[in-house]
Amino acid sequence: DVFKGHTVEEAEDIFICGTHATTPSPQLVSKEWPRPWLYSRVFLMFTAAFALLWLCCNLFGNPNALPGMIVVGSFTVPLSTMIMFMEVNAWRNISLYKVIQTFLVGGCASLVATLMLFSIVGSHELNLIGAIVTGIVEEAGKAVIVFWFLSKMKRLSILGGLLIGASVGAGFAAFESAGYALQPVLAFFQNSGYYAAYGRQLDASMMMDAINQSIIIRGFLAPGGHVTWAAISGAALVIAGKALRRFDTSLLTDKRFLRLFIIPVILHAAWDSPMSNIGSSIYLVPIALTVIVWIVVMILINMGLAEVERVTKRQ
């Protein structure tokens, strides 16, 4: 439904879902394959804001707009993808407030959890072993936070697990991308003193080119990265929890969870490994991994809809 016309009221109906007054009863939950569209409007809105801030920085040379450009540009695709998962949640039982809370607090908490794990295992070069370690550590860091948020929910579902996982992953991706986009700025100021000592002037246009490239490339690849990897972990936790009929920390070592959790770990490791150098000029490996992860997500969405049908038949 992306290319169909939609009213403001339709968008508002999606954004107000999940409250005590707006959560539908199980009998009214749709069992049809979801047709999300609002995420595309969110994407266009953020893209327009980014374009305007880009003009301020690149056309008019106003540095005051640079922080906004970095933040808006880095958040555009992760947030839009998160909204898509919100639309896919047929239960309509998770509010926008909860989603934003999970995005902000969960995203930042997953960064802290990941850094804590790295402080234990140490950082590695991104060779094959280093990529595997990175995949395990970062996906485990996100999974722990996803588990915590899911443990606070009254009703667990596969589609809800996908949404909570995607929200944590989107926060992780957005803040990480903003950090990468900031690196050229830090390098610029670090080098400016060196250049000044030799009476030379540093060209700021190279810095801006590097920032723009980082934002655009990471945004382009974001749908196949942290958002969907964490979404799979969220669904895996719910599937394992329903099989065990409990939701506690034992899930994190349960074979049902680990069988699915290994998928984002492998995809993440492959993404960071030297294998990514194959066809790097056209981002062949990341694009191929994106296709694979979305096939897995589609399978999980189908499982979630089958769960909806089972539950509604019992009502």
Describe the predicted segments one by one.
Residues 1-315:
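Hydrophobic alpha-helical segments at protein termini of multi-pass membrane proteins
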